[in-house]
Amino acid sequence: MPKLQSEPNTRELGQLLRHWRKTRNRSQMEVSLDAGVSQRHFSFIEIGRSVPSRETLIGIANALEVPFRDRNTLLLAAGYAPMYADTGWDEQEMGRKWPRA
């Protein structure tokens, strides 16, 4: 089991998850079913009473279709190290000429 990198900020994590759930117009039940966790456990995570495992958090992020660039924020709030590289367009890609349609 991965160790926590820092003290979890359960309030921030819950607020972030609630934001993504509302943005996606999903109920707690829908998200919990898609993530493979009980609705009660998801509710406890969202209100800050429980800290999910890294795997559970990734499953919830998948269920909510959280963009990869925003998943690191969720991981950090839960006390885990980020796992997604923050890569942008590099100069070579920006200078590439794309074929016209």
What feature does the model see in each segment?
Residues 15, 25-26, 52-55:
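Residue-level signal for the short linker/turn that defines the boundary of a DNA-recognition helix
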Residues 30, 41, 51, 70-73:
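Residues in the helix-turn-helix
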